[in-house]
Design a protein with these regions (language model features):
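Extended, charged alpha/beta regions that create polyanion-binding interfaces
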Residues: 1-125, 148-152
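Phosphate-binding glycine-rich loops and their immediate beta-loop-alpha structural context
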Residues: 99-196
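Non-transmembrane, aqueous-exposed alpha-helical and coiled segments at domain scale
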Residues: 2-26, 145-150, 165, 169-218, ...
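Accessory terminal and edge-of-domain segments that mediate assembly/interaction
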Residues: 39-47, 63, 69-83, 127-131, ...
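Flexible, glycine-rich phosphate/dinucleotide-binding loops
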Residues: 58, 162, 260
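Long, contiguous hydrophobic alpha-helical segments, chiefly transmembrane helices and signal peptides
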Residues: 43-51, 55-56, 60, 89-92, ...
Length: 365
């Protein structure tokens, strides 16, 4: 179900690579809107634009704006001829052809087909940090950089939340700050520096084609949930962890934790992490948590121990000292916010993410 509106662009707001914020007059009222120029071009003041306002009407948190679907005044010119025949956002009105790392027209096709480690599906022990929430990304990088500032890091964005890479202010800020050496959008996600058809290919390309020392895998902004055991988008982190295991990488889990979430199921260790570890994970993974004696960490470690005991895989709890984590987090070039709470309001999710980054650095030769 889509709620359609048309309006007139009144103001061009903040712009960055891949996204432009607008103020659009709809039915006489100012409406915040977002245009992704690679999809719909760059609107100008006075243009009539067609908007999808469904998420805005429902008050869904991550978006907070209408989405420009088309510019009725000046449709963008045809793009220049370019290689690539893999379609993403398939069979939607905004489907597009991209050049993926794997396909025949790619300069990396031969490596993706002939490289012995790629063909064998062998990450050769590359650390892969896996997080449920997109907001964990800067904290992971902060911890990693504090321990190994010269490590080459790639971010793989999966397709279980936002599909356009350009939707993320956070990722754009990390790229601009030089904190990410490369980005790959996998599956139906699109718009990263590189495109991949599968997470498996993305991981192998990060290691053997793009020269990454560490990969961080997380969905984009817009985590979906339903207050049920199996109906939430972050469940796919279990599939990613299993992929890392199959490909002989070293999986490092960022457990989802909170000391202040008003929902009991997410207080302490989230039931999301418990479900992934106890019901989905089939291989090995290191689950990093502070060794602090202060709340909520003893409770979180007890919850993790229970999940590990019930697991069909072989997860391992790694308890690390958290001294200096605050200093690591203070270096972030982008604001730290998770589920509407800053690091000042609740540092726990960022502490676990930073320690996961430190642990990944410790796994490097």
């Amino acid at each position: 179900m889509i709620h359609w509106r048309s309006g007139t662009v009144r103001e061009i707001g903040r712009a960055r690579r891949g996204a432009v914020r607008l103020t659009v007059v709809v039915d006489g009222a100012d409406t915040p809107a977002l245009a992704l120029p690679e999809l719909v071009g760059t609107p100008e003041i006075g243009d009539t634009v067609l908007l999808n306002v469904s998420a805005l009407r429902r008050g869904l948190g991550t978006g907070g704006h209408a989405l420009v679907v088309a510019n009725a005044t000046r449709p963008p010119a045809d793009p220049p001829p370019a290689p690539g025949h893999i379609v993403k956002a398939r069979y939607t009105p905004l489907q597009q052809m991209v050049l993926t790392l794997e396909e025949q027209e790619s300069p990396h096709h031969e490596a993706m087909r002939e490289h012995s480690a790629v063909a064998a599906g062998d990450l050769q022990g590359m650390p892969v940090v896996v997080a449920e929430l997109h907001s964990a990304l800067p904290a992971v990088l902060a911890g990693l950089r504090s321990a190994r500032p010269g490590a080459r890091v790639g971010y793989i964005m999966t397709d279980t939340a936002a599909l356009p890479f350009a939707q993320s202010d956070l990722a754009a800020g990390l790229v601009d700050a030089g904190w990410l050496d490369t980005t790959i959008t996998a599956g139906q996600a699109f718009g990263g520096e590189h495109e991949a058809i599968t997470v498996h290919s993305a991981l192998l390309a990060a290691r053997h084609v793009l020269g990454c020392d560490v990969a961080v895998v997380a969905q984009g902004p817009g985590n979906a949930g339903s207050s049920t055991t199996w109906g939430w988008s972050g469940l796919a982190t279990g599939d990613v962890l299993n992929a890392v295991h199959v490909l002989r990488g070293r999986a490092v889990v960022v457990p989802r934790v909170s000391a202040s979430d008003p929902r009991e199921r997410h207080l302490g260790l989230s039931h999301h992490t418990t479900t992934v570890l106890s019901r989905v994970l089939l291989g090995s993974a290191d689950v990093v948590v502070p060794d602090d004696a202060t709340a909520p960490w003893p409770q979180v470690r007890a919850q993790l121990d229970a999940a590990v005991t019930a697991s069909s895989g072989t997860p391992r709890v790694v308890a690390l000292p958290s001294a200096g984590v605050g200093d690591d987090l203070a270096t972030s070039p982008v604001p730290l916010s998770s589920m509407g709470r800053s690091a000042t309001q609740d540092v726990t999710p960022f502490a676990t993410a930073a320690l996961a980054g430190r642990h990944a650095a410790a796994l490097l030769p």
